[in-house]
Amino acid sequence: MLRSLVGSEMCIRDSIYTGRKSGTDDGIDVKEQRSTRTGYYMKKRLRMDVNRALGSVTNQQHYIPRIRYTEMYLAYAEAANEAWGPKGDNGNGYSAYDVIKAIRKRAGIGGTSDPYLEQCAGDRDKMANLIRNERRLELCFEGFRFWDIRRWKENLNEPVRGIDWDRDGHSFNEFVVEERNYEDYMYYCPIPNSEILKFSNLVQNRGWKYCLLYTSDA
């Protein structure tokens, strides 16, 4: 995931992204609603071959995938592990183990030896945790994590954490950006009230009794 993040004071190519340089918007809360709250900047979908000079215009293609090959691999691996275990394939030719091994090898992990993967190869629960972590890394910042942690019933009360990099000291300090307080019913989203009014047998999800969300008829 670190390949997708840029932190304050981190070196990217020939530039140092600093949170302490005056006269810029860089750094934690330097300018309201414009600066980073966490000390992180996202780099995943940025092209590194553009002219970064202020005021310059670069004509480069920017592609946003609708569905990715690796996304389908990960979905298959998760389902296969739940249905047939880490190495079962039900005659399809590929097991969860095979798929995750291919994904990790493509990322430069394991190659001829992958001890972590092998530790999970004989245990469904361990393989499930590995697959979840692979989804977290491979699909980060692509809109999957929000839904994944809810369908897995993960703890939603983890605080949002940030880092303050110290370039001179080669260290960083972690801090809490925001506390999160969720109730169990929040694993499910509310049904818009306008939809409930259309069908009397439709019951609002538990905990959202007084939800006043509406949908557009457009």
Where are these regions (language model features)?
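Acidic/polar-rich alpha-helix caps and helix-coil junctions
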Residues: 8-9, 13-216
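Positively charged, low-complexity/disordered segments
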Residues: 1-7, 217-218
